[in-house]
Curated annotation (Swiss-Prot):
Zn(2+) binds at residues 70, 72, 85, 88. Its EC number is 2.7.7.6. One of its GO terms (biological process) is DNA-templated transcription. This is DNA-directed RNA polymerase subunit beta'. Its cofactor is Mg(2+); Zn(2+). Its main location: plastid. Binds 1 Mg(2+) ion per subunit. Binds 1 Zn(2+) ion per subunit. GO terms for molecular function: DNA binding; DNA-directed RNA polymerase activity; magnesium ion binding; zinc ion binding. SMART domains: RPOLA_N.
Length: 623
């Protein structure tokens, strides 16, 4: 298969026309034969264990099961590449083509796409300007809809008729002296398709724009909603009739595999059962139409075909959910695509990438704002190519194999080289869900023991992280451009403001707030001890470290600075030599005879002194 390198700006998901669906599955073989249509519900032959021709696993349509080998075994080996076997009609190719080659089913009757019928808002209902209930009545063969009222005064365009009402009109229509002409009614997806075909989008959009200027209230809202849908159809150049399926795509067989288990039984994807139901009903409808079966039987078969296609696209969206073995609902195409475990979020957006790791985060209060603690074991694995390069560059080993052996032995020199390698090499930390750009930031790694990533507590609000078991992913920017970009744009200190509000996002939270509160909190159970006097803050901290006092013990400590205190004096004592002692609730002042301050003691706790020292050190102030 030739590889094509093509750059693109975006991926657009759009409605597919029947011709495009056919084009996906239809292929012209080198011998001129056109293949692609799946006509049989069979999967594999249970005696030969080979796929049935024209079935859901057909090798002629989807490609060979074994590399470079046709179905009958006439051609084997890569030298026959591109040859189509005359006996079985299978093209000799790689088996991996079965992962991308599609097929299609030509439906005997049109069916509505359940997403456009049953999703809210219902696009078919909005476009036709018919209530959803009424559209469903028509689609599932409960009511008729007037597609042409003709000259009948009692009928109007898009009017719903019951079975009895239509029979009464039909009787009048086929009478010899009947004056009724041009009356047409329809039922099922065919009728909806005809109504959609009758809509001229450009004309309808123009008339709605004029209507919006005149009408008010609910009618205006309804018209705006309808105009928006019509404008989208015009903008994407989509035909409304494409919401009615006449050709059904069949996804590649290797995306809905069938595997043999040890006991000889087979495990298969639910999609195969759902496709088989569609094919059985489609083939039965074709046979009934060929033998000119009564209308009521054909109509019932068309309804069953509609329900089987609904179940294939979105099982359970409408009507009874199709169950498999053990009374378990079968997984439809929608179930495979949507949700956290779906194809987009699990496999496409959530891919595992090289040079990345994941671990629990713990608080690292000793880190700088631009640093994070990276476990040594993880760092060695992530930076291994850089370490190997450095070991060879320094002449410590001769080749990659020897370097890997050295790393496996955990030699001391390896850790020294790792320290050198991570210097100035930023790493990216990401916490899911990444709801804004600050969910992924760059840090300079610091090697730490253990297996947890250490995170600076100030960056927690940006990541919306806490330390109750949260995990974060680590990514290594490899190229110099990526490293420069991470350092210049993504480093944590440069992401100070929230991009949403412009307010500071680097602020104390979680453990920091709790720690500050705990340090400064008062303990009512602790008694003010008049005998605990200290000459300075250092003595208090020494007493705390030697466990003579507790973190919340009240102490009197000498302090000669200014104290802003509005407390009233509770007692005044006269001392020898006309000296005075002024006692306040939280301080004691000793004054000389001229009222000059001699000494002052303040009431505090070791916790408050600790916080005070940290604040003053960070502000680079001294007493």
């Amino acid at each position: 298969m030739s590889k094509l390198e093509q750059y693109f700006d975006y991926v657009k998901i759009n409605l597919a026309s029947p011709q495009r669906i056919k084009k996906w599955g239809e292929r012209r073989l080198p011998n001129g034969q056109v293949v692609g249509e799946v006509t049989k519900p069979e999967t594999i032959n249970y005696r030969t264990l080979k796929p049935e021709m024209d079935g859901l696993f057909c090798e002629r349509i989807f490609g060979p099961v074994k590399d470079w080998e046709c179905h009958c075994g006439k051609y084997k080996r890569v030298r026959y590449k591109g040859i189509v076997c005359e006996r079985c009609g299978v093209e000799v190719a790689e088996s991996k083509v079965r992962r991308h080659r599609m097929g299609y089913i030509e439906l005997a009757a049109p069916v509505t796409h359940v997403w456009y019928l049953k999703s809210l808002p219902s696009y078919i209902s909005i476009l036709l300007d018919i209530p959803l209930k009424d559209v469903e009545q028509v689609v599932y063969f409960n009511s008729y809809v007037v597609t042409k009222p003709g000259n009948c005064t009692n009928l109007r365009y898009k009017q719903l008729l019951s079975e009895d009402e239509w029979i009464a009109i039909e009787d009048q229509l086929y009478q010899e002296d009947s004056e009724l002409t041009g009356v047409e009614v329809g039922i099922g997806a065919e009728a909806i398709q005809k109504l959609l075909r009758d809509i001229d989008l450009e004309v309808e959009a123009e008339s709605l724009r004029e209507e919006i200027l005149v009408v008010k209230g609910i009618k205006k809202d309804k018209s705006i909603k309808r105009l928006r849908v019509i404008d989208n159809f015009i903008a994407t150049r989509s035909d409304p009739t494409w919401m009615i399926l006449t050709v059904l795509p069949v996804i590649p067989p290797d995306l809905r595999p069938m595997v043999q288990l040890d006991g000889g039984r087979f495990a298969t994807s639910d999609l195969n059962d759902l496709y088989r139901r569609v094919l059985n009903r489609n083939n039965r409808l074709i046979r009934l139409q060929e033998i000119l079966a009564p209308e009521i039987i054909i109509r019932n078969e068309k309804r069953m075909l509609q329900e089987s296609v609904d179940a294939l696209i979105d099982n359970g969206r409408r009507g009874r959910t199709v169950m498999g073995a053990n009374n378990r609902p079968l997984k439809s195409l929608s179930d495979i695509i949507e949700g956290k475990q779906g194809r987009f979020r699990q496999n496409l957006l959530g891919k595992r990438v090289d040079y990345s790791g994941r671990s629990v985060i713990v608080v690292g209060p000793q880190l700088e704002l631009n640093q994070c603690g990276l476990p040594r074991e993880m760092a060695l694995e992530l930076f291994q190519p850089f370490v190997i390069h450095k070991l060879i560059q320094q002449g410590l080993v001769n080749n990659i194999k020897a370097a890997k052996r050295l790393i496996q032995k955990n030699e001391l020199i390896v850790w020294n080289v790792l320290e050198e390698v991570i210097q100035g090499h930023p790493i990216l930390l990401n916490r899911a869900p990444t709801l804004h750009r600050l969910g992924i930031q760059a840090f300079e790694p610091i090697l730490v023991e253990g297996r947890a990533i250490k995170l600076h507590p100030l960056v927690c609000p940006a990541f919306n992280a806490d330390f109750d078991g949260d995990q974060m992913a680590v990514h290594i920017p490899l190229s110099l451009e990526a490293q420069a970009e991470a350092r210049m744009l993504m480093l944590a200190p440069y992401n100070f403001l929230s991009p949403a509000t412009g307010d500071p996002i680097i602020m104390p939270s979680q453990d920091m707030v709790l720690g500050c509160y705990y340090l400064t909190a008062e303990n009512p159970s602790q008694q003010v001890n008049r005998s605990l006097y200290f000459s300075n803050f250092d003595d208090v901290l020494l007493a705390y470290e030697t466990k003579l006092i507790k973190l919340h013990s009240y102490v009197w400590v000498r302090f000669n600075g200014n104290v802003d205190d509005d407390d009233e004096k509770i007692e005044e004592k006269k001392l020898d030599g006309n000296k005075k002692l002024h006692i306040y609730p939280s301080r004691i002042k000793k004054l000389d005879q001229d009222n000059n301050l001699m000494v002052q003691y303040i009431l505090t706790t070791p916790g408050r002194i600790l916080l005070n020292n940290v604040l003053f050190d960070s502000l680079q102030l001294q007493f």
